[in-house]
Each structure stands twice: as C-alpha cells, then as structure tokens.
Amino acid sequence: MDTVNPTRPRNVACAIAGLIAVLVVFHAAGALAELKQEGAGIVKSVVDGDTLILTDGREIRLVGIQAPKLPLGRRGFKAWPLAGEAKQALEKLTLGKRLTLSFGGRRMDRHGRWLAHLHTKSRLWVQGALLKEGMARVYSFADNRAVIAEMLALERESRAAKRGIWGNDFYQVLKAEKIDRRRRGFQIVEGRVLKVAPTRRRTYLNFGRDWKRDFTIVIEARSRRAFPERGARLKKLEGKRVRVRGWLRWRNGPMLTATHPEQIEVLGK
C-alpha cells in the first residue's frame, strides 16, 4: 500500500522557493551591471505590493513593476485580486532588512517617491523575486527602461507556470480581436498587426480592418524617437504577432498608447 509522506509538500515547496531564489540572484547579476547603485536603507514598513518605506522616511516605489493594488484610503476603490498576498510577499522579502538602492532612469516620481531597484544583502533582486512569484507585472516608462528585458523574461516564466496573478482571470492576457468593453486600466494584449499607418502626428498599429471598432496601438510623434530609427522600423511589425502592455482606453474601438519599444514584444509571424 502506498503511504502519504506529510513532509513532502513542504519539502517540494521549499525546493521550489530555493530554486526561484537562485534564478532571481542569477538574473540580478545581469541587472546590477546595468544599474547604478546608490545608497541603502532598512525597511520600516510596506505600503502595498510595490511600495515601501525606509526607517529614514524615504518612500520607495519599486520601479519597473506593478503589483495588485490596494484601496489605500481611496473612496470607492476595490482592491484588486491578490493585492493582500502581494503586500505579504513584499513584506516577507524586505521587512526589517537592509536593502541596496539602484537606479536606471528617472529617480523620483511626482509623488516624491524614489524609483529604485532593490537588492538584499544576498544580492536577491526584489523586483525579480516578485515577478518570479507571480506577484507583479512588468510596468515600464519611457524614462525608466533599464533591465526591462530581464524582467519580461521572469514575467514570461511566471505566466507560463500560472503562478500568483497569472492564475486569476483579472490579469489574463487579452486577445486583440476580442476585448470586452468593460475592460479598463492597465492591460496586456496579444494579437497580429494588420497594418502600420504612419502620419505626421502619430503612427497607428491597426489590428483589424475597422479602426472604429478594432484594437489599435497609437504612438505619438514625440514618442517615435524612442523607437529604432525614430520609428521607421515600425513598418516591419506588419503581419507580426505582438504582445503590448499599457493603459487601455476606448476611443471608437479599444486603444493603447505606446511611448517606448519595451511595451511591445514581438512574438513571431
């Protein structure tokens, strides 16, 4: 007769956690090379899944990721799924610990929060660990694009394994040809670019024949300079399958604005 070993699940979980830590440290080695280390601090408290406060009063927004959001006093705001778990994950990684701050772009946001990458004494990359555990998504800006490739790789692995948020429909990757009109906010969308239409003021990446109904990526003229050859190579995306992330809005059909190339991943033909 087979017997059940009650310690096995715990051992397996510990082994998986250990493997994740090793992989994140490996990714951190490459990430550190691209970032400028400057300062350190001890974590006093955690605000939510991507924000914490140091003992010296500095508020740190973990740049490059977006964790599920908590209301944080906002009237009528409903917590996103797994927001509490994401906060707990960040607490487990950082609370009471001394962290090194590293920067790869703009250093402070309009709220006065420091936009930093964080590493523990053992060189564990905090952003990488959260992505690996499925407790955050990659969330980049035109003025903060460092180590995005490394973060996207960790996110892809986590999504494929359906860890954390990737097992919840709220965070599912949307299909460009079938976006529910109730969808709003920060989204990830996949589909095939049918046509690239550059104009003087902006470039449109159309995913269907009817621009009044179908999904479109918009790149403003001022943002084209961030793309290879000032946007001239965008034409090569025609016929390609891509994954794009950003804030979804509805203007005629569903629309998403891209300000930098890291928002658009080319998946193939």
Give residue spans per PLM region.
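Small beta-barrel nucleic-acid-binding modules, primarily SNase/OB-fold domains
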Residues: D2-G18, L23-K269
